[in-house]
Amino acid sequence: LCAQTRSLTKDAQGEISETSDVPTSFGAYQPLVKTEYWPDIDWNNVERCPGCPEEDIPFVLGAGYAATKRYWTYLRGLEGLVHYGSDEAYISLKVWREGGRCVLLKDVVIGHVYRMEAPYRMHSEKQVFNSLLISSLLYPQSLRILSFTGAFLKSPETARPSECWKRRTNISAN
């Protein structure tokens, strides 16, 4: 389940207000033509089922999403990811591949103050690893090859399929 996200901003005095120039989003989707690593997801700003209190969405994204502990454990959560990045794509793809669905609850709205920069150091090699791990575990071969090729062209030293394959084998075996 995914809540509707309301974009908020915080000014220099710490006052929080709704961001007026950000359109309402309805979950997220995976663009197939993108200059970033795969899997990458973008906000979906098109409502497919106006008037409905909920609708299926390709990917969860934003301030709040939830599952029962039992289902999370069954899916093995975010096991295998080594750092922040690709969390929503990973869990969403696992849900769909397992036969579940990602559902947006339009009446549940959570405000989220988005920051311009992360307060922690971004580790691009770990983000690349996460993307390649997800590709190797959850994509069909044709998309897996495309994902690895894109990662290699962007960063040959971090796109080592052998490392992801070792990690994939360990996760798949458990």
Regions found by a protein language model. Give the residues of each.
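A recurrent flexible, glycine/aromatic-enriched loop bordering the glycosyltransferase active site
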Residues: I41-A66, E125
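Active-site rim elements
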Residues: E55-D56, G80-V82, M116-M122, T149-A151
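Conserved donor NDP-sugar-binding/catalytic core segment of glycosyltransferases
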Residues: L1-K34
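Short, well-ordered loop/turn and helix-capping segments at boundaries between secondary-structure elements
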Residues: R101, M116, L137-Q141
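Donor nucleotide-sugar recognition loop
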Residues: F59, K69, T73-L104, V108-I110
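Terminal low-complexity segments of carbohydrate-biosynthetic enzymes
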Residues: G14, L61-G62, H123-N174
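Active-site donor/metal-binding and catalytic loop motifs
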Residues: L105-R121
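Catalytic cores of nucleotide-sugar-dependent glycosyltransferases that transfer UDP/GDP/TDP-activated
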Residues: A3, T9, A66-A67, V109, ...
